[in-house]
Amino acid sequence: MPYLTSTGTARRTSGAEQLGFGVPGCAHPLLAPAEWAELARPGTPLHWAVLDIDDGPGIRPDPHCLEAAGRLRNARERAVRGEDPLDSVRASAGRLLGRLDLVHGSRPFGDLVADAQSYLDWYRVDGFYLDRCPAGRPDLPTVRRLTGTLSALLADSGSARHGGHLVLGHDTHPHPGYAEAADQLVTFRGAWTDYRWSQVAEWTASYPPGRFAHFVHGVPRTHLEEAMRIARWQGAGTIFFTDRTRETDPGNGRGQSDPFATLPRYWDEIVSRIGPAISE
């Protein structure tokens, strides 16, 4: 695993620090209406959810996605105004992120910026999820250029609160320099069988848990508590754990199965374990 070091002196989070959900790839709202409704439900400790229409924003506004985006935005705004004291969708949470596929650094800069502008114009997204982001040092200047441009677009759009939110989907520990290029890094995405024996890069201890996210599939219900302990120990504040697997769940349209396309069967239980988010 790139840039993985000993965990000997790493600072870990305390059990008291609250986890929240990052939802990396819910299926299209037409196929998963119940899932999108759950994300906007009061009491769900949602940090953010990713919107992906057709491997990007598509060629025109999608009415089903417009409705889902509006529902999530309205839930967040109600919470910000304090209309529902138990609603987890706070000023810094419940964000809607548009998915941009960097294809490990091979996607042209202009195409990514054009997709980002479409997300902003049509869906008023709060930020972007940069999927398949490179992790090596040579690609760092290119990624920094992109995140700087995206931050400027978000600031100009007026739709994103506090300048928007950028997440880099490395799915592994990247070069430490990436930590200054975005708001959050996905440093693990994979199977439970790998996660339960995983290690953490020591440099991550210099940052708060809100800077890192872990996505794990194939987590048995009986191991939820263990999975949450690992996330806290490794300093990840945003998680998505599911019992679904690549072998048993539907494809993502590219001939691959996607265990993150729907919510886990124990969704209500994991929401209860984490509890509603606390107002900031």
Which functions belong to the PLM regions below?
Residues 2-280:
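Glycan-processing catalytic domains of CAZymes
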